[in-house]
Amino acid sequence: MLCVIGDLVEDIVVWLPESLNYGADTPSQIVRTRGGSASNVAVFAARIATRENLNSIGARLIAQVGDDRLGEQLIEVLQIAGVDPCVVRSGRTGSIVVIVSPDGERTMLTDRATSTQLLSAPDNWFDDVSLLHVPAYSLFSESLATATQACIATAHEKNIPVTIDASSASLIEAYGVSEFRQVIAKIQPQVLFCNTDEAKTIRLTTDPINVPLVVIKAGASPTTLITRDGSTTVEVAPVSQIIDTTGAGDAFAAGFLNSYQNVYIGVDTITDISLRDCVLAGHQLAARVLRSPGATMDTQ
């Protein structure tokens, strides 16, 4: 199964029908959902994997969540979705306020609390794992970053492929571009996901990283696939009635990786045709999230 390591928090999504009235009331629509990039990927992947078997476990999440009622609720949501929550309970559960302006622009106020304080993960949490996915958010904050590197080392020891999502151009810049490139080189992921801003920040087009597959998303524009044999692009089907972009990138990763692990685990040859199918699966799942509030697939 797919295993993801990272954050499990509450998302508080605020839609503004008009500009924010500073110092006064602003009528808004507010929705509270489970959030965190890692938990998003795990839930979306589980929804795919458990579609035909409602009693199965579709994905695993390694995370730390608060020893509080909110933490209990988030774990319950994971279990209902078909995720195996391998979590440490300690401290206070984190929350992220996502403010969506009338033009769709998102501003996030983050309080990750205990979600960045994971110290370690036992080896048996990797039993039955076929692929480990790591959002780069998990590499930027201690002690989660050290725990994540230890999990990656365990994955390598068990011959479990690792994939990385670049997550955030601004956080990469704050972390240090050269330092981030060195981390990627050390991790040796099978796949690196990024959007155009992240690809530009990492200098992927001018100074390629030695990764078997780089996937560059560009919203509604074609997705670029870069392998050691060259590059190709895949057209993106238009999406109507977009409600919220929160979690769409995580949904793409989940859809892509579900197809990828079914085709490529244990296989040495990567073909453009099969990779295109992975991209299409990613965008198909992302479209469902784009039509739903927050990082959910409530609208089918």
Predicted regions and their residues:
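Ribokinase/PfkB-type carbohydrate-kinase core domain
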Residues: M1-L8, I75-V88, V100-T232, I265, ...
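Conserved phosphate-binding/catalytic region of the ribokinase-like
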Residues: M1-C3, L204-Q300
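Glycine-rich phosphate/adenosyl-contacting loop at the front of the ribokinase-like
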Residues: M1-R60, Q73-E76, I96, I242
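A general structural signal for well-ordered alpha-helical segments in protein cores
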Residues: A38-A42, G71, T148, I164, ...
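Short, conserved phosphate/pyrophosphate- and ester-handling motifs at nucleotide-, phospho-/glycolipid
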Residues: A45, N195, G249
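Beta-strand->loop->alpha-helix junctions that form or flank phosphate-binding loops
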Residues: V31, I62-D67, G82-G94, P212-A218, ...
